[in-house]
Amino acid sequence: MLKVSFFSYKGGAGRTSLLFNTLPFLAKELNANENEPIIVLDLDLDSKGLSYLLPNKESGINAIQVLRGDRAISLRHSSNIKNHPFFSQLSPIGEEVGLPAELNRSILFVSAHAKEGATYLGENDNYDAERSSMRTVSRLCQEYNCKAIVMDTPAGNQLSGVTALKESNKIVSVMRITNQFRLGTYEFLRQKSHELQNKEIIVVPNAVPDFSGTGFDMGRMFADILTKTTAALEDSSNRVNCTLLTDGNKGINEVNLFKFIEGNLLKLSEIRPLGEDELEAVKMYELLAKELANGNN
């Protein structure tokens, strides 16, 4: 089963909109369906970015309850996933990301919005407990033949993010191509290179602007990212995947619409024709989905 975290060392990388737009293509690659769904968790408990992109999709059980080990997670109540006390409380979002109605329950969402007044992990929470709870969720999803767990994590070194990284077998490392993002990402990977074991880290330059007239050499910059990302993880058991910035790929291009409002481009294509920049981004979302599904489909 695929277990993937979308991660960025700094906020503002466009991590959540990247996840939001990759989801429908990942569902197609994995052949997700209502009996073998993808489970999506918004673990960015402060910003709640994905939860805000999915208004009116609060789940009956939220991410804080998941991390604290809600009783529903440990129950083996039903052989039917749709009747299980955990999965039955999750919000179907397939249609929200452009899938047909019959595949609405192929993607189930755990919101970060708290219904019972708990808005953060308190001082009595601890790393080991959170990690244990995520493992329990992972085992439950494996037992019920879920295709994947997809986790939107907070930036930096926050508890829920580190927990997700530890539990993942693939990590999408999202960065802008600015100097701050590059240096911060390299440093974080160096720090975590021996804490994280046997991970595939997919490096994704996101919202890449037009280089024309800037004096920067895009090829040289991408080669530098490849070299330094690989060096940051050398002597560890982790593997770097730089498919999205090699073989003529230039990361995921900047989408003009997303400067004003984030959205799902596949869903948007049902309303109007996509622009050139949007179509180019969709190609890269599809490529990322293929890289994520590789070995898991």
Placement of each model-derived feature along the sequence:
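Inter-motif core of Ras-like GTPase G domains
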Residues: 158-179
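P-loop/Walker A phosphate-binding loop and immediately adjacent motor/lid segment at beta-alpha junctions
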Residues: 121-138, 185-213
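C-terminal lobe/tail of nucleotide-utilizing enzymes
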Residues: 194, 198-297
